[in-house]
Swiss-Prot record:
SMART domains: AAA. Part of the ABC transporter complex LolCDE involved in the translocation of mature outer membrane-directed lipoproteins, from the inner membrane to the periplasmic chaperone, LolA. Responsible for the formation of the LolA-lipoprotein complex in an ATP-dependent manner. It comes from Ruegeria sp. (strain TM1040). GO terms for biological process: lipoprotein localization to outer membrane; protein localization to outer membrane. It is found in: Cell inner membrane. GO terms for molecular function: ATP binding; ATP hydrolysis activity; transmembrane transporter activity. The complex is composed of two ATP-binding proteins (LolD) and two transmembrane proteins (LolC and LolE). It is a peripheral membrane protein. This is Lipoprotein-releasing system ATP-binding protein LolD. PROSITE patterns: ABC_TRANSPORTER_1, ABC_TRANSPORTER_2, LOLD. Gene3D superfamilies: P-loop containing nucleotide triphosphate hydrolases (3.40.50.300). ATP binds at A43, P44, S45, G46, A47, G48, K49, S50. Belongs to the ABC transporter superfamily. Lipoprotein translocase (TC 3.A.1.125) family. The gene is lolD.
């Protein structure tokens, strides 16, 4: 059995607890993700997909349950440890790329590496390597506004993988793209996962894309159901 990259047990999250507007979005979520595995997370808007990804990626905390990333138990972990694990072991991709508009494609990939203590030279080499993997080596000097939507999202993938994470969390990464571009970007994502051997949990409304992943998990009434 391959290494466990992400393990979640008994995750619970309620918003506005104790008020008339109380909403329990996660009601005991369990999930195990192995190295190299790509898993789809499917649910309607407002069902808790983003909340689950944020807790899994240490951007939010659950009311109950535990999260383990690459063998590191995050239960009760201090902010400093959570930040270190998030920077080193987790990569994020969102529906909207959130690239910094004043920086080039390459610079957008270099910056998170510098924040993680990587030298400028090594960060630029890693950025160039990733851009070449997604076919954008000739677009390295272009700012986001000069790139197409699909190109911007490919740069966002590269940025997410810049620090060589073990886990990629993607929230509707193709949701803002037309069908043809969405398919192309998804293929690039699968190529990157294959090249790096990381694990990926990908939230999507696109059932056709979901069916091409290793497993499909549906978030229903706050729990995960595999189909």
């Amino acid at each position: 059995m391959s290494e466990v990259t992400l393990k979640i047990e008994g995750l619970r999250k309620t918003y506005l607890a104790g008020t008339p507007g109380e909403v329990a979005v996660l009601r005991g979520v369990d999930l195990t993700l192995h190295a190299g595995e790509v898993v789809a997370l499917v649910a309607p808007s407002g069902a808790g997909k983003s909340t689950l990804l944020q807790i899994a990626g240490l951007l939010d905390v659950a009311d109950a349950g535990r999260v383990e990333i690459a063998g590191q138990d995050m239960a009760g972990a201090r902010d400093r440890k959570r930040t270190r694990v998030r920077r080193q072991d987790v990569g994020f991709v969102y529906q909207f790329h959130h690239l910094l508009p004043e920086f080039s494609a390459l610079e957008n990939i270099v910056l998170p590496q510098l924040a993680n203590g990587i030298s400028q030279r090594d960060a630029e080499a890693r950025g160039a390597e990733l851009l070449a993997l997604v076919g954008l080596e000739t677009r390295a000097a272009h700012r986001p506004a000069a790139l197409s939507g699909g190109e911007q999202q490919r740069v966002a993938f590269c940025r997410a993988l810049a620090n060589r994470p073990r886990l990629l969390l993607a929230d509707e990464p193709t949701g803002n793209l037309d069908p043809a571009t969405s398919d192309q970007v998804f293929e690039v994502l699968m190529q990157l996962v294959s090249e790096t051997g990381l694990s990926a949990l990908i939230a999507t409304h696109n059932l056709e894309l979901a069916a091409r992943m290793d497993r499909v998990l549906h978030l229903e009434d706050g729990v995960l159901v595999e189909r």
